[in-house]
Swiss-Prot record:
GO MF assignments: enoyl-[acyl-carrier-protein] reductase (NADH) activity; NAD binding; trans-2-enoyl-CoA reductase (NADH) activity
Site keyed Plays an important role in discriminating NADH against NADPH: positions: 74
Protein name as it appears in the record: Trans-2-enoyl-CoA reductase [NADH]
PANTHER family xref list: ENOYL-[ACYL-CARRIER-PROTEIN] REDUCTASE [NADH]
Record: active site: 234
Catalytic activity: a 2,3-saturated acyl-CoA + NAD(+) = a (2E)-enoyl-CoA + NADH + H(+)
Keyword set includes Disulfide bond: no
EC supergroup of this enzyme: oxidoreductase
Its job: Involved in the fatty acid synthesis (FAS II). Catalyzes the reduction of a carbon-carbon double bond in an enoyl moiety that is covalently linked to a coenzyme A (CoA).
The organism's place on the tree of life at top rank: Bacteria
Residues annotated to bind NAD(+): 47-52, 73-74, 110-111, 138-139, 243, 272-274
Binding site for substrate: 224
Amino acid sequence: MIVEPKFRGFICTTSHPTGCKKNVENQIEYVKENGKIEGAKRVLVLGASTGYGLASAIVASEACDAEVLGVSFEREAKGKRTASAGWYNIESLKKFSEGEGKKFISVNGDAFSNEVKSEVIDLIKENMGKVDLVIYSLAAPKRKDPVSGEVYSSCLKTVGAPFTSKTLDFHTGEIQDITINPATEEEIEGTRKVMGGEDWMLWIEALKEADVLEKGVKTIAYSYIGPEVTYPIYREGTIGRAKNDLEKTAGEINKVLKSLDGEGYISVNKALVTQASSAIPIVSLYISILYKVMKEKGTHEGCIEQIYRMFKELYEGKLNLDSENRIRIDDLEMAEDVQKAIEEIWPQITSENVFELSDAEDFKKEFFKLFGFGLEGVDYSEDVDITTV
């Protein structure tokens, strides 16, 4: 069938298999052009199908020549309904890896569950022995507590007081005022349970207990801080509370891994167009301005550039750590001159000048690319088989 983008709010409900494959191929090509990294050899990526998780799986496989086990929870095609972009991404990476004689194992299931943890441990024992790097890059709206069975939901709200600011509807290019209401205590706790560090710790404990962690193992979870303009909705909101919990967990994981000479890190990454960030009010406008400023300065990076740089710094012993022992690959975003330029543009921006003062057009293009649309070298008028790549 011919696949076109269809939307429900900020969610694209269709994905293009050939476009997703091209997107993965472009990231692989970037890594190949930039050379090998002497690093991890057996890698577990939790949340491997999109964004920073997908980039981590690609860099591990292509730059480090590592065996990779990727866990994700994606939808296969059914009838005339396409598979999710993440499903096509994983299938594409699997095909490219197999074509190069590399080992890439994928598990499609709920990484929060005990069943998937057990399945992954068995697969590591059978195929890899032990892993020397665990990437934690899970993003989900809900999580079922594996002990109590209770289902928790995450939400995007402020903490304490409502917050009004401007945001971008990237479909129309309109700048609108938006008010975000504060979360209840229950919503704050729900978001922490879904997006905090609890499940990361459960994974590390389960892997250690099963004796599938190599001596000197490293584990990294991804976080974001950003500038003050986004604090009320992000860093000081429900998501920020969950990220604080995630960051606190890194210190606790260090204690768990001490006997293995292992290390747990948080990597604070750059703001990028992802399925998650496009739905966050205020952040979409900030990213549009950020992209314009960083491209003009020649410092813009996407997921693959960020993660390649992080792996290189990690394994060459050149990590840029802050006072809280967090890896900072958001350094170029948070550079004083970049943030000063954004602060100057922010109060001036309106629906009339948004395409002039920001990269709103590119935000939209990048969003479409997440689902395999708008990539060069893909004929979108062609009939495609939506069940495969």
